[in-house]
Structures are given as C-alpha cells and as structure tokens.
C-alpha cells in the first residue's frame, strides 16, 4: 500500500513540473512560446527557407493564438513575430537586402512608395555582416515593427500598413517560399 501511495505521489509530482516545450526544425530549436512586451505569443508553425535546394534560414511565426489563414495574419493589428535563424553561410547582408527588396515589390504589387521610408529603415537593419547562426526577431507590437539581431534590438518603426506589407513577404500570394509559408501557417 505504501508503494502505491508513494508511486501516486511521485507520478503526480512528475506531471505537475512545468515543461518548456520546444520544436526542432532543421536542427534549430524554436521555443513554443515567445514574450513580446507584455504579450505571450505561441508558435503557429515553422519551416525552412530554401533557395536552389539549399537551406537558408529556419523561420517561425508567433501569434497570440493559432491561425491558418494567411490573409488574416497579414491584415491583423495584433502582436505577432517572425523568428529567423540563419543556417547557411550563403546568406550575406547584400543577398538579404536584395531578397527583402524583392519581397516588398511582390507583397505590394510594385507599389512601395507609400512605405518606402520604412522599407529603407527595415533594409538598414540588415546592413551589418550576417553569418550562420545569427538570429533575427521581427515583431509587431503596439503599432510598430521592431527588429532584433542576436537578441539585441536594432530599431523600431513603422505602422500597421508597413507591417501588412512586411508580413506579406512571407504570407502573400507570391511568398518568399511557399513551403516556408505553409510551415509557418502550421500546415506542414
């Protein structure tokens, strides 16, 4: 009887210990939650950005609640974030800037003039050397976009209109990578 009681007590203790779940994608561990300001965001999904069959970065989308509709994510004025970890030495600052510029062109249908100043600020965040293992957190909170590199905030600017174009790079009709889009939407 003592063994049964002790077993039940230990079992109850083991299951009451909090666990910090994580998700691994392409060798990169993404936490299942992320704190942005006062908000706790949950990992919606993640995937790998590929180009010419090479893995470039692992990306994860964090939202206040899970969502699979890409248009709702783009239009939403709620806190959200994209986490990226560079997994290839092929990504340089110049290549990242080119990809971002191309992404904004596609996301806005070529009409970048209303947000051009914010695009330039965003691009400036990628001017420093980029190397394998670098992390970027692009978050939207309290009406502004914030960019952090390796855990250090670089800049904060923009508004909802800019955020919509920015998230359109990953979730628009012509995303940077369709498989990454589906992964971050939780479909893969």
Residue positions per predicted region:
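Terminal leader/tail segments of proteins
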Residues: 20-188
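Positively charged n-region of N-terminal signal peptides that target proteins for export
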Residues: 1-4
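Bacterial N-terminal signal peptides
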Residues: 7-16
């Amino acid at each position: 009887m003592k063994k049964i009681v002790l077993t039940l007590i230990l079992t109850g203790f083991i299951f009451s210990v909090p666990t910090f779940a994580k998700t691994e994608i392409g060798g990169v561990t993404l936490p299942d939650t992320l704190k942005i300001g006062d908000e706790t965001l949950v990992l919606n999904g993640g995937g790998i950005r590929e180009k010419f069959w090479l893995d470039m970065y692992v990306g994860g989308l964090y939202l206040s609640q899970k969502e699979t509709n890409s248009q709702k994510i783009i239009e939403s004025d709620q806190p959200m974030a994209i986490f990226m970890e560079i997994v290839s030495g092929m990504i340089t600052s110049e290549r990242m800037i080119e990809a971002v510029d191309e992404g904004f062109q596609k996301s806005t249908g070529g009409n970048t003039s209303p947000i051009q100043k914010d695009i330039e600020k965003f691009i400036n965040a990628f001017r420093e050397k980029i190397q394998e293992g670098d992390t970027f957190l692009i978050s939207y909170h309290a009406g502004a976009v914030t960019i952090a590199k390796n855990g250090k905030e670089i800049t904060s600017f923009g508004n909802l209109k800019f955020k919509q174009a920015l998230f359109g790079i990953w979730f628009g009709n012509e995303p940077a990578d369709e498989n990454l889009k589906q992964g971050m939407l939780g479909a893969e």
